């Protein structure tokens, strides 16, 4: 599957600006991690892009629709990573891709939320300030902090370095992401 084909799937199911920005930000972070780990960065980017593609149109079935669609077109590895990121299914984390999606999804969204409450947005945002916000349970309360912790542990990265990596990717793409 090409990125353009993946974007067509995303845009057929997702219309809201917030979810589209989340998809784009996770796409970019996953692409960067794919390069960092010497993996197929296009596949990693597509996984990040599509991980919540069916959430807006089919919230009660998420991620069943997108997983089934991906399996039908032979994208089993991406489908498995998306299945695993939905922790309620209890799917095992078999590959680095599976672990990276879990590690990047919630924390990328959380980092964007941190930007939205700062006058200077992403500029000057530090891992220390993101970690401080993580401790405030009332801030971005829907973010699953235990999933962030589990993802970081599974991926085998340091939380501070992981946050710094995400900030760097978001900062490099701030115009595209409007942050």
Show the residue positions of the predicted features.
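Predominant activation on well-ordered alpha-helical scaffold segments within soluble catalytic domains
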Residues: 7, 11, 24-27, 31, ...
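Acidic/His-rich, divalent-metal-binding segments that scaffold phosphate/diphosphate chemistry
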Residues: 1-57
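C-terminal binding/interaction regions
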Residues: 14, 127-129, 134-179
């Amino acid at each position: 599957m090409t990125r353009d084909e993946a974007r067509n799937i995303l845009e057929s199911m997702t219309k809201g600006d917030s979810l589209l920005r989340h998809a784009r930000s996770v796409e970019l972070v996953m692409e960067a991690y794919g390069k960092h780990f010497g993996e197929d960065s296009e596949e990693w980017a597509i996984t990040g892009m599509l991980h919540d593609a069916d959430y807006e149109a089919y919230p009660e079935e998420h991620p069943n629709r997108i997983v089934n669609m991906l399996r039908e077109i032979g994208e089993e590895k991406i489908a498995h990573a998306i299945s695993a990121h939905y922790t309620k299914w209890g799917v095992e984390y078999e590959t680095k891709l599976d672990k990276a999606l879990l590690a990047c999804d919630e924390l990328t969204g959380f980092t964007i939320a941190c930007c939205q409450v700062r006058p200077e947005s992403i500029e000057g945002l530090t891992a220390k300030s993101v970690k401080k916000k993580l401790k405030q349970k009332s801030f971005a309360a829907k973010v699953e902090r235990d999933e962030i912790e589990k993802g970081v542990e599974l991926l085998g990265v340091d939380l501070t370095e992981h946050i710094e990596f995400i900030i760097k990717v978001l900062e490099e793409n701030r115009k595209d992401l409007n942050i």
